[in-house]
Amino acid sequence: MSSAASDVYKRQISSWLGDGTLGIMITNTQYKQGFYTAKEAVIISVCFSLVSLPFSTVIADQLGFMHIFVPFYATVCIASLACALIMPRVYPLNKFKDTTYNNVEHLKEDLVPKGANIFNFGLNKAINRASNAPSIKDILVNGFKTVIDMYIGLLPLVMAWGTLALIVAEFTPVFKIISLPVVYILEFLKIPDASQAAPAILVGFTDMFLPSIIVSGSEINTMTQFIVGVLSITQLIYLTETGAVILKADIPLNLKDLFIIFLTRTIIALPIITIIAKFIFA
């Protein structure tokens, strides 16, 4: 299995059970060490991750969907899979090249020799890797330093973005104005209460929880609340979480790229989520 493929699994596991930011930190470390290219790092960072199961239950509970949490989260997985299949083939992800960080050597994994036993080959590779690994103390110290540096550096930014976005969403018409094109898209998809749901869809770029807060506190159609809740998880790029970590990391993505990725994921996922929601609430 290649480093890029194994990192996809590590990233998904860390995201499902912990936090999406942990997956990005793993990706960034592997990228800097030369295990894969800029293109691989970017795709892994913005495609192969889901909001953690615990936080997904928080969103489902906020919207009153805990009784249908399995189809709720299954819809997230289906829409996210569609995004992962399409996103690497469109802008901006298709612009990145197979170059390494600071031109370090690209550490490609060895292929299994013809006729060799896969288990024995993998076991020998694991033993060799373990023999060169740092001590447990070094691993813990380096991991602690990385986490502290990441979260202390991000905490002020996260609080600032979250507070500002909530103020703008609740007390100004900014999101209502910029979401007018989204209203027409929702109406085309025959989603009820389109004018109320549209601002919640765009505000997801700032924080994943704000869309659910906005639609749960109003008399919006239940199916529309389901669509907004699932979409807020599937959008994946939030300035108060994954977006901030990506911008702080060495992965070659800027704010413009993140916003385009956010919009692209929304465009891909929205019709899929809507179709599934219409079946669930038929």
Predicted regions and their residues:
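Intrinsically disordered, low-complexity non-transmembrane regions of multi-pass membrane transporters
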Residues: 2, 93-146
